[in-house]
Amino acid sequence: MNELQQLLLSGKPLHITTDGFRQAMLTAFPLSGKVEKPEVQNTLGLLSTDQLAYLADHTWYQLETHEALKKQLEAIRQDNSQPAVTLTDEYANEEIPENSIAYHRVWGTVMSDAYWFFSSKQLAADLMAAEANPQITCHFLHVNSPGGDAWFLDRLDETLRACTKPIITLYEHLCCSAGYYIACHGNRVYALTANDYVGCIGTMCSFYDFQPYFEKLGIKLIEAKADKSDLKNKTFDDLRQGKPEQYVDNFLNPLNEQFLACVRSMRSGLAELGDGAPVLRGETYLTAEAVTTGLCDGTRTFAEAVAEAVVMGAEYTEAEKTKRSIYNML
């Protein structure tokens, strides 16, 4: 298994079908579960003692985020034009400096609950921990995602809306579908370059039907249902047989309406658009057109976005002080 993990994480070209790669990834890196000591060379290199200790109470994805944050902080430190700032993934640590910025990395396929990959549930927990930490004054969403699992996004939406501290979003390369579902909650949403893709607002389902292939091999599916179970799996069976209407009406459309309601409420430029607008039908845009359509607010470098987050955090702190002063006078 370690050899398979090492091969899949090596970045080397693999002569393998898409389905074969997916199956290999799910076998080598199950969506949940912990690994005691991953003795595998990967994009992080051979794990150090500190990294292994970190994995004792964190997921693999959290370790990747932790290491990515170190690199970003080092780049900021080397830029003498940028003021000192504390970006943190220690959301519950109240010993960090005042006016710290909570760094939330939304990288890769969105999963609802995962150990090796980004987890919507974990993000919700991290947001709540950062909200409760008086040392943190702003949330920084760093997004590079093509989308993914729709389940739990309604709960994550509630958590993001409930945040009282400001949120800034910086996306790079891809900010699509479920990735944008998360990213749009930023008070300000920025692209890293002029050539980042954003949008793909919509809901879909796809899968392969291997039953005809297996039947050619002489492997026939046998199925029986109780007399009073005639509707059991009927919607899915109809979908597989080329009759998707009920599946679309009962599952995809309700999920899509939630998605559309979310982006319309979070992005004023999309609020008044009709259902026929391409941006609300799944179209994807480069940055210039994304600004015009209201998907984002322009471009920022990572350092510029962090500096803006610091200002937003300071404004939040001053507003909170003013509120407390008013309450004390009443």
Regions found by a protein language model. Give the residues of each.
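N-terminal organellar transit peptides
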Residues: 1-330
